[in-house]
Amino acid sequence: MSAKRILVLGGGFAGLWSAVGAARKLDELGHGPDAVKVALINRDAFHNIRVRNYEADLTPVRVPLDDVLGPVGVQRVEGEVAGIDLAGQAVTVTTARGLEILPYDRLVFALGSQLLRPDVPGLAEHAFDVDTYNGAARLNSHIQGLPRRPESPGLLTIVVVGAGLTGIEAATEMPGKLHTVLARAKRMTPFRVILADHNAWVGSDMGEPARPVIEAALTALEIETRLGTDIASISPSGMTLRSGEEVPAATVVWCAGTRANPLTRLFPVEADRFGRIPVDEFMRVQGVANVFAAGDVA
């Protein structure tokens, strides 16, 4: 009799804990890999502590998955999930070897969320983000290079778009980053950090009690706020508001919202406005046999 197979899609917090938790429970029950195999599929070999991508030192935010999965006997498959056959209980993965079809007896769908990028001209080409490790590393490299660039309007102005939790964390980290970079370059020029959002207040999802605390922290760091602001376009030299106002800035960081992985569309269920699929109290996808969902997709 062949071994049963648990497939976990995604190496974020939800996926990693699902895989490790399954391996631990199987060990407690005395079921070895000859009875049940656990495999985790992720696009690369790392777990990214995404909620810390705004930090200046990115070294601790990237953890090799094999260091966690190997000791508990979880197989790692490196590749991009291309499709899911819910009726046939199989996942199609694009790997370095080509397309591979992996069968499952139980599936954990934990592919997370991604930054929402609306159709704003120049956003894809000129804005930075902290949504991924590579995006955060690109932003850090850009900031470190600012002192070497010729003087221009907005050279030392950073605009963070999106005053939710990620945007607030990113914005409050920027003064320290800029101060360190400028001190290292012996160029203590004044700089600006602006937090912009289309809402009328910061931290709108965190409730009224949190607002005074957030506003006090922003004031202490001399971070400007531009609220009730809509972005019309982004260029290498800054951004244009819908009002027509030009805001010179060499650095625009987009943190305005996230949406569940688009593969949620493969499930025959009605997703919410963030693309998340409904689950029951045991994290089972409603109406879909042998499939669980966890994290930002559920």
Whereabouts are the PLM-identified features?
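FAD-binding core/adjacent interface of flavoenzyme oxidoreductases
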Residues: 2-3, 74-159, 186, 253
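Beta1-alpha1 glycine-rich phosphate/pyrophosphate-binding loop at the start
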Residues: 2-78, 168-205, 253
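Short hydrophobic core segments
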Residues: 9, 102-114, 231, 239, ...
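Short glycine-rich anion-binding loops that position phosphate/pyrophosphate groups of nucleotides
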Residues: 14, 112-115, 171, 258-260
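Short glycine-enriched, charge-decorated loop/helix-capping segments at active-site entrances
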Residues: 52-57, 124-128, 210, 268-270
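A conserved beta-strand/loop element that lines the FAD pocket in flavoprotein oxidoreductases
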Residues: 72-85, 219-234
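Predominantly flavin-linked oxidoreductase catalytic cores and closely associated redox partners
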Residues: 125-221, 225-227
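FAD-site-proximal beta/loop scaffold in flavoenzymes
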Residues: 125-150, 239-240, 246-298
